[in-house]
Amino acid sequence: MILRHVCLTSALALGTALPVQAEMVFNRIATFATPQNMAEGEDTARESSAEIISASDDGMTLVYTDSPLGVVGLVDITDPRAPKALGTIAMGGEPTTAHFAGDKIVVGVNTSESYTNPSGKLVTVDMATRSVVAECDLGGQPDSVAKAPDGSFVAVAVENERDEDVNDGAIPQAPAGFVVKVALKDGLPDCAAKQVIDVTGLADIAPEDPEPEFIDINAAGEIALTMQENNHIVVIGADGTVASHFSAGAVDLDGVDTKRDGALNFTGKMEGVLREPDGLRWIDNDHFMIANEGDWNGGSRSWSIFRKDGTLVYEDAGALERAIVEMGHYPEHRNKKGAELESVEFAVFDGVPTGFVVSERASVIGVYDLTDPANPVLKQILPSGISPEGIVALPARNLLASANEVDLREDGLAPAHVMVFERAEGTPAYPMITSAGTEALIGWGALSGLVADPEAPGMLHAVSDSVYRSAPTIFAIDATQKPARITGATVVTRDGAPAQLLDLEGITNDGEGGFWLASEGRSDRLVPHALYHVNAKGEIKAQVALPPELLAVEQRFGFEGIAKVGDVLWMAVQREWKDDPKGMVKLLAYDIKEKTWGAVHYPLDTPAEGAWMGLSELTVHGDWAYVIERDNQIADKAAVKKIYRIALADLKPAALGTELPVVAKQEVRDLLPDLVALNGYVVDKVEGFAIDAAGQGFVVTDNDGVDDSSGETLFWSFGPVQ
């Protein structure tokens, strides 16, 4: 099954592909891991998070909520390229939102003992002393808190959230939510004069149980409120009474992936999907934008702009999600709500009304020119950390900051992060590879092996691994463009159907227009270690299984690269198998004509404590074989991501079962500096390396199909290879 695509040009694709006059763009300039904010002597292995984020009036300090630790965290961004930890302040509960109010910080804190007996407080912290100076009882569980632009009051969305384990999470579930309005004087709340605003009886869905979710205030002092599970929006006037309210409505979606089946298939339809908005931001005194995340029965994979009278001005209808697909960030494992657009932000940068839309599951931020609210223009998509929850714009400093909530260190993965972006003249650094511009939408991800066209410089092919087990695919890449372009996708087939039980980790040319593919086996999932010969259409023409000698000693970590030298296929085995000495892995040789096997041993670097070392690619160019050797560590724990070379003359395989010769290796390049070039954290899986016909080296990382990953794919050339 083969898909050939004619390249077209979209506004976003044109802006990133062709040389244009320099314009103002956002690029990431710093990353701050939340464990850095823990004090000396604290258990830094504890779960930490960065959820909702805001900035001081001068834009020099960020505050974020960290609910697992029950604190708010502070970050000094006086130098935005070098954020500094300012520590945390305990809240005596679960902080939900924090805002600066002059030299104070006001924080919504959830203190509920149960869903049926919710409670919470509005806490005020004096920044000079870092002490709590006031607390207001809110009478329920707070979610979002907003501060009026003039600093005169705050409004709190008291959600009194539902218990999802009761009646399958259906509402109504008492008690009902409401809104609290509290005046501020010198940053201190006037608790005695707080106003409780009833929003029952408004929604069509469970009107007796409003579930306020997100709240924002415009320059006129009007409050806009999303009630997510109720699929309703409420506008409260400056006098504290309901001025208007309306259903958030529904969206029809076409060309979406509707099944979680290990394949990217954008041909489905979803009709009448409730928006169920989460985040909301006023654009001006008449319009606001919403992110239609969904939480109960909806989630329309879109964002919208409404007038405050309920008139729909703009509906994205999945356009941002399609752009996310082109970037390789579509989270196939979360299909119901797709990319799950969570929150929004708005600010005016140098006279340009600019909207930001955050995708929680795709871990990206869409940047829009909202000069005409009826016709937003997508300008960029920025990479963020894993599961961005909150975002704050600082237009006076040309900065943007995101709070990324998921901490995966318990699984050996990345911590939660705050990321800082700067708006400056230049070109977008990300994406580095995209399928934008094709006639039909090409979804992709988990690029795990790379090979160059033997004749055309800059032309490459890559394979996807078992994340997309139902549609293993070979991608054609044009790396002469910037960003590199995926121009075609060929599904690997067996007997006319997408081949099953493959985990493609290596690809090499067969010299006849087809490819040899290396599949990493996993016996506990019935996936065999094997080699596959496919033609240009992706049809499997031959399969080579492991011989008994190797099957007897195989383990999970198998083939991670393949290269062809004459009639011999060479494969890198990622980690030691049962018969390998510690620190030695096999480079396996298979003679295609003689149908015989042999091997040599490759010496691995010594891993740090708690880490393992392995190979993740093998390619041949000139008189050398090149491998990627890496540890399995990520972020600040990553220590080894390197390219080594072995002289082909030394690749003299011995028979299996005999003592294997040990080859000598030479370091070619340390990839760690390349992996932080975009000012993010170091990803663990550097998986593909190829040298093109002009001798240029290309590297690609595996984004794990955006599963427990930010989805970032780094693709770059470091120039001529020695």
Feature locations, PLM:
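Gram-negative bacterial Sec-dependent N-terminal signal peptides
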Residues: 1-22
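Sequence/structural signature of beta-propeller domains
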Residues: 23-722
